[in-house]
């Protein structure tokens, strides 16, 4: 009993001591404040003078096994010990005489002529019998794309080294070799080939490895001599202000004299400080200050409500709060614009996955919600710049990097270096490292850098700070269900200098890390220099909110679209100087056909089906200011989906989001994306998102959809309202198709594109100007077997002008079979007979650097393809093809050679090159009953005749085939003779689709003697057939050719008609004009009707005069 009483007494004394300490450290006096945290950074050690040697270690989880004879079994290689990276390889009986140990991840980048070491410990599991020995091993580095073929066909390694050693012991023996590669190896896969003296017999055996590693040698630390100071050669990428936000510590909110302490019982109506397990409501009309000693920093607070007349203000002192829910109807203050906090404040959100709204109705659970009329202000210490770029290239094993911009980062903080690899999601080479020391723009890390990160003059990997002093995070259990915390603001909110990690709730709408939700037009809200890491669902969301600013933020390792404009009504927001990196699709990434894409439907595992194509910036309404942002990775870096109507909460709003053009898109960068779909791009204007009218669920298709951008976002057929989506000063690199635009109108002015399949794929009325397009530079990129082109001209009904562009480094690919497999500047799209090019492409002021003449144009000859036969463009100054005069470029057929003195055939390009002179390129369509039916689709080999040049001194046959698919393109102001194998028709229509002002087609058609004609024209969509006429008989073919198109003539062999379009006046509105080049419009529709009758000769039952002879009209016409 006495012992029990003593224990009680000791507990009581301890309780009094605790109370006394709390009273001393957390007074209730209204003037008392805890000491504010210091803004001082930890002292940095000096940078070293020597970079230590570093090891890249390979354990069992980093490797897999390959062998011949269908003996490849991943289970053959198993980890034994993580401590020493020990692994075993079980070799079954009858195993082949060698096998391969293959690294799962890319090898370190290796510098030429540097001595590296490869080492390991090796032992046998059993003594080998029957004279079998491990004779030698070969260390090799292969192109990653070759690995899958090694067992079936020869692939030359990029480097290999065979060595011998003691491989016969059942106890570990160490082996070290020194090797040096003759050329830089940026991207490769390490393979160790283990060779036996002969194949195994009937015994199962085991071998063991441990401590396998590549050692990068030590080296002196010397600052590179030519650090990058300008991140682009041609364009201007704007940057955030170099200065820190101004501070006035006299305004700090914790200094206000009317504050009451949370820990003071008198603050509360019942004179009791609330306990964590209670639902806590801040007293009405009070401004309550939380200090570290005010609350338990380990217990979990259930729910805190801040009423409309109340405020909850945090002291600037180190604090941890564990909480489930916070509802802000009044004000939540943790620093302000002029008083950024320096404390380490950690808010940890707790709660299991649920659909119950525990914060408040519609606000979900496990987070902070700010209702309409509420206000939240969270401001941590400003670290600036929040992200920058490398100032020099970083190699595997380096520990020090140099960056371009001034930074005030601190020792112990974490830093991201983004990938310099194309396929970001497949081969993750993003690296997160910890700062060991820092001096100016030089940063030393605690561990060596594993991968190569490019920092050349063309482009540079981004370097971002991932640490902040204020952290909002989900609890450790959040990983189990991808159900983290979330911050939702329906009022006004100001966030700066905070980190949000393990936030967002996967596939739960409106539960994102940081989210402005139906806040309408905000007046003083922003998100600045924050960072989101390891997000389960998005990063920063703007939903039903206008006039919000997101600037200088970072996001890394994010599931689903990251910077996310949700419903399509979000306008007049500003996204500036933000970085998104390593963004993941939800589920398998979207793929599908080249233009059709794939369709996804809303379901519980994909509540926003567009997340199948998740990217860094998702812009459902383009009318926003988007400046100086960068997107690394993702399905696309920037996505502009097409929405005919808003979705979600705004599905009944009368608006067409897709009709809005870009308000400002200036100085943005995207890389390492677009590769997951054949038509994918790093900046993607395409895809379609709708609400199914029957089910009410979202449906997303990734593919080609029109985007009719017009004034004020109001769709119209009136061309005076047309607006072009404009992309200024844009950079893409390590991309598939760079900037992809399926829409109706686009201008890309100021573009740098490097190491990409193509810089852009532009549809509609498109202008690409003031650009550098560089085929290859980064050694990671050089090691890939990509077939790159400077631009591919489309095959029908678009208009594309390329002006003021420098193309560089398109190096011949010796393995290419066809021109369009090669690295060439201009590539033709030649696969179809249904889709044939009119005059739709032009170039002007083109510069070529380090490009052989053979690599300038690639045109694949496809006999059954009209898009091959009619490929053409006009080089308005001859700068691309080297003629230095306006030049018509036409396909391989002599049909394009209108004059021997002005046309030459280029065998490398398989095209004709002709001086333009007064000629142009035009297009007409013949519509013939029972033969060529408008809109009908037929096979490419459905040949029905030909069209041939005549007159102007032409005596030989210069023709091209025509098929049952309508459409012929050729050089205008020349003679064209139509020949149909089945005879000439009693009736046909000729649509003068593209016969420009002052141009014509002198048409000849053979008919039997005695044929008479009635010929008229129809301006189909004009009032009372304006400009239509009836043709009259001329006295000669020459008179027809010199006429205004109202004459025809029949010489008893050929009918002659001059095809013109009298509607045209030469107005600039009749063509697409940009950069000094033009493309004539297609006119819908001016049609010639030709009726033929013959009293002496009867047509066949299909209406054709047969038994005609193929004879060209006179060459003197």
Curated annotation (Swiss-Prot):
It holds the Pfam family CEMIP_beta-hel. It comes from the Eukaryota. This is Protein rliB. It comes from Dictyostelium discoideum (Social amoeba). InterPro entries: CEMIP_beta-hel_dom, G8_domain, G8_domain-comF-like. The keyword Lipid metabolism does not apply. PROSITE patterns: G8. Residues 1-23 form the signal peptide. PbH1 repeats lie at residues 522-544, 545-567, 621-642. Residues 266-392 form the G8 domain. It is found in: Secreted. One of its GO terms (cellular component) is extracellular region.
């Amino acid at each position: 009993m006495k012992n029990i009483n003593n224990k009680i007494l000791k507990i009581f004394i301890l309780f009094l001591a605790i109370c006394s300490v709390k009273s001393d450290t957390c007074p209730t006096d209204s003037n008392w404040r805890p000491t504010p945290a210091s803004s001082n950074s930890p002292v940095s050690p000096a940078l070293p003078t020597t970079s230590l040697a570093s090891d890249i270690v390979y354990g069992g989880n980093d490797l897999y096994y390959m062998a011949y004879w269908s003996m490849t079994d991943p289970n053959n290689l198993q980890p034994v010990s993580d401590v020493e990276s020990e692994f075993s390889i079980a070799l079954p009986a009858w195993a082949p005489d060698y096998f391969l140990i293959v690294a799962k991840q890319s090898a370190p980048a290796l510098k030429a002529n540097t001595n590296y070491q490869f080492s390991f410990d090796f032992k046998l599991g059993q003594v080998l019998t029957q004279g079998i020995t491990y004779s030698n091993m070969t260390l090799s580095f292969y192109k990653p794309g070759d690995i899958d073929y090694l067992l079936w066909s020869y692939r030359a390694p990029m480097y290999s080294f065979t060595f011998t050693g003691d491989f016969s012991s059942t106890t570990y023996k160490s082996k070290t070799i020194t090797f040096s590669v003759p050329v830089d190896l940026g991207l490769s896969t390490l393979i160790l080939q283990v060779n036996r003296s002969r194949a195994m017999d009937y015994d199962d055996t085991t071998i063991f490895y441990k401590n396998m590693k590549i050692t990068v040698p030590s080296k002196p630390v010397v600052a590179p001599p030519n650090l990058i100071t300008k991140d682009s050669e041609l364009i201007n990428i704007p940057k955030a202000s170099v200065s820190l936000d101004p501070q006035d510590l006299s305004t700090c909110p914790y200094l206000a004299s009317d504050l009451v302490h949370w820990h003071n019982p008198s603050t509360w109506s019942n004179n009791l400080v609330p306990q964590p397990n209670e639902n806590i409501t801040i007293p009405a009309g009070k401004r309550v200050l939380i200090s570290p000693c005010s609350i338990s920093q380990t217990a979990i607070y259930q729910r805190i409500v801040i009423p409309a007349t109340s405020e909850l203000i945090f002291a600037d002192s180190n604090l941890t709060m564990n909480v489930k829910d916070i509802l802000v109807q009044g004000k939540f203050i943790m620093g302000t614009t002029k008083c950024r906090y320096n404390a380490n404040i950690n808010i940890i959100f707790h709660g299991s996955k649920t659909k119950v709204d525990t914060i408040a109705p519609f606000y979900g659970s496990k987070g902070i919600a700010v209702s309409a009329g509420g206000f939240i202000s969270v401001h941590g210490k400003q670290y600036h710049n929040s992200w920058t770029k490398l100032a020099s290239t970083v190699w595997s094993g380096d520990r020090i990097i140099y960056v371009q911009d001034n930074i005030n980062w601190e020792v112990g903080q974490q830093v991201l270096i983004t990938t310099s690899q194309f396929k970001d999601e497949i081969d993750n080479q993003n690296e997160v490292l910890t700062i060991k020391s820092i001096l100016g723009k030089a940063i030393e890390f605690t561990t060596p850098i594993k991968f190569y990160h490019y920092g050349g003059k063309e482009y540079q990997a981004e370097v971002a700070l991932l640490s902040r002093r204020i952290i909002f995070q989900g609890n450790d259990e959040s990983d189990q269900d991808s159900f983290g915390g979330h911050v939702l603001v329906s009022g006004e909110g100001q966030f700066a200098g905070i980190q949000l990690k393990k936030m967002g709730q996967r596939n739960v709408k409106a539960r994102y890390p940081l989210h402005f939700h139906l806040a309408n037009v905000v007046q003083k809200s922003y998100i600045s220099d924050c960072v989101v890491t390891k997000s389960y669902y998005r990063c920063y969301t703007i939903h039903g909110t206008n006039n919000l600013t997101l600037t200088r933020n970072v996001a890394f390792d994010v599931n689903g679209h990251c910077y996310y404009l949700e419903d399509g009504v979000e306008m007049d927001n500003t996204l500036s100087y933000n970085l998104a990196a390593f963004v993941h699709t939800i589920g398998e990434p979207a793929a599908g056909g080249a233009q059709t894409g794939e369709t996804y439907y809303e379901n519980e595992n994909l509540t926003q089906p567009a997340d199948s194509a998740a990217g860094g910036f998702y812009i459902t309404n383009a009318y926003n200011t988007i400046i100086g942002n960068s997107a690394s990775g993702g399905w696309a870096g920037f996505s502009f989906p097409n929405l005919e109507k808003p979705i979600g909460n705004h599905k009944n709003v009368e608006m067409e989001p897709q009709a809005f053009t870009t308000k400002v898109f200036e100085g943005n960068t995207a890389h390492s994306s677009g590769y997951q779909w054949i038509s994918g791009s790093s900046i993607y204007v395409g895809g379609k998102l709708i609400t199914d009218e029957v089910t009410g669920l979202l449906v997303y298709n990734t593919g080609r959809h029109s985007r009719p951008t017009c004034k004020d976002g109001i769709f119209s057929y009136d061309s005076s309202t047309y607006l072009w989506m404009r992309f200024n000063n844009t950079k893409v690199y390590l991309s598939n198709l760079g900037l992809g635009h399926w829409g109706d109108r686009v201008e890309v002015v100021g573009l740098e594109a490097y190491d990409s399949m193509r810089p852009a794929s532009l549809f509609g009325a498109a202008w690409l100007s003031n650009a550098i397009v560089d085929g290859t530079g980064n050694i990671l990129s050089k090691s890939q077997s990509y077939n790159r082109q400077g631009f591919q001209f489309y095959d029908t009904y678009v208009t594309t002008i390329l002006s003021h562009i420098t193309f560089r480094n398109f190096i011949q690919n010796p393995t290419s079979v066809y021109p369009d497999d090669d690295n060439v500047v201009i590539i033709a799209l030649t696969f179809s007979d249904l889709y044939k090019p009119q005059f739709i492409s032009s170039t002007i002021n083109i510069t070529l650097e380090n490009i052989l003449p053979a690599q300038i144009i690639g045109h694949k000859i496809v006999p059954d393809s009209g898009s091959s036969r009619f490929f053409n463009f006009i080089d308005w100054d001859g700068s691309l093809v080297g003629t230095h005069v306006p030049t018509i470029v036409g396909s391989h057929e002599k049909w394009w050679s209108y004059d021997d003195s002005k046309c030459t055939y280029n065998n490398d390009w398989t095209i004709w090159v002709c001086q333009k002179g007064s000629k142009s390129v035009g297009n007409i369509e013949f519509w013939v009953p029972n033969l060529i039916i408008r809109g009908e689709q037929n096979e490419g080999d459905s040949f029905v005749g030909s069209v041939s040049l005549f007159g102007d001194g032409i005596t030989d046959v210069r023709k091209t085939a025509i098929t049952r698919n309508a459409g012929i393109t050729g050089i205008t102001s020349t003679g064209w003779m139509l020949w149909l194998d089945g005879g000439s028709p009693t009736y046909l229509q000729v649509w003068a689709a593209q016969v420009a002002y002052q141009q014509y087609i002198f048409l000849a058609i053979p008919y039997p003697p005695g044929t008479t004609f009635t010929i008229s024209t129809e301006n189909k969509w004009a009032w009372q057939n304006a400009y239509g006429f009836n043709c009259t008989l001329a006295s000669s073919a020459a008179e027809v050719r010199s006429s205004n198109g109202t004459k025809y003539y029949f010489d008893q062999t050929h009918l002659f008609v001059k095809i013109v379009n009298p509607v045209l006046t030469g107005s600039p509105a009749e063509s697409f004009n940009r950069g000094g080049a033009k493309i004539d419009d297609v006119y819908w529709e001016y049609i010639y009707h030709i009726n033929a009758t013959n009293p002496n000769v009867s047509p066949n039952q299909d209406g054709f005069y047969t038994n005609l002879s193929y004879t060209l009209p006179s060459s003197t016409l």
